[in-house]
């Protein structure tokens, strides 16, 4: 039996452009892989989930990774419960930028907010064309061990690898994000000691299940809003927040 008041959990997804952030979110919310790559400015997605037998309004924010939006992007950061930082396992620069761009940007306004590190496009590790292109530039795919090491270095609460094309690992990411939002340390009083890094709570006595509703509906464009409540049982997808289509950058997603 479902009990309790619905809690809103805001998750913001960041990372370099074209690393697969939008594909990850679309696959999770619609169970369909997008055919075309269209650069994002901002989109948000609302999903009704269950955590520990309680309803959760999961609000997912998709952001632009391009430098053109460096001043606009942080406007989506207030009241964020969890950040998901993505990099492509076949784009080493996107891994390096986590330390030099994304983590510093987040810490300017949201230091201490739980972070989940995600390596995307794992299916391309076995793609001959991709491997050939990497070899030409004397590079190789980012290994899982490198991702694990970076997650520890930046204090991420979880690390995942996934493929939006195959669906491998996708659901686990968002289940972990909800858990991290519920288990993040409460705001301490001035007399309490505060830690420099956020980590999973150790007070949870047992793991909780996160379930996903599957009914979807669409809505028209509206200003960014992260806390719109919807009836139980509904899974809503909000589209069109400043979505930009750049013909020069349009290409098949991986």
UniProtKB/Swiss-Prot annotation:
Statement: the UniProt record of this protein carries the keyword Lyase: no
Amino-acid positions noted as binding GTP in the UniProt annotation, renumbered to this chain: 15-22, 62-66, 120-123
Motif extent (Effector region): 37-45
UniProt biased composition (Low complexity): 186-231
Region (Disordered): 186-254
InterPro entries hit by this protein: P-loop_NTPase, Small_GTP-bd, Small_GTPase, Small_GTPase_Rho
CDD domains on file: Rho (cd00157)
PROSITE patterns assigned: RHO
Key words, A-Z: GTP-binding, Nucleotide-binding
GO biological process per UniProt: actin filament organization; cortical cytoskeleton organization; establishment or maintenance of cell polarity; regulation of actin cytoskeleton organization; regulation of cell shape; signal transduction; small GTPase-mediated signal transduction
UniProt keyword Aminoacyl-tRNA synthetase, yes or no: no
Source taxon at top rank: Eukaryota
Record field: compositional bias (Basic and acidic residues): 232-254
GO molecular function: GTP binding; GTPase activity; protein kinase binding
GO annotations of cellular component type: cell projection; cytoplasmic vesicle; cytoskeleton; plasma membrane
Entry-linked SMART domains: RAB, RAN, RAS, RHO
A Pfam short name: Ras
Similarity comment: family membership: Belongs to the small GTPase superfamily. Rho family.
Name by which UniProt lists this protein: Rho-related protein racD
Native source species: Dictyostelium discoideum
Lineage: Eukaryota, Amoebozoa, Evosea, Eumycetozoa, Dictyostelia
Name of the gene: racD
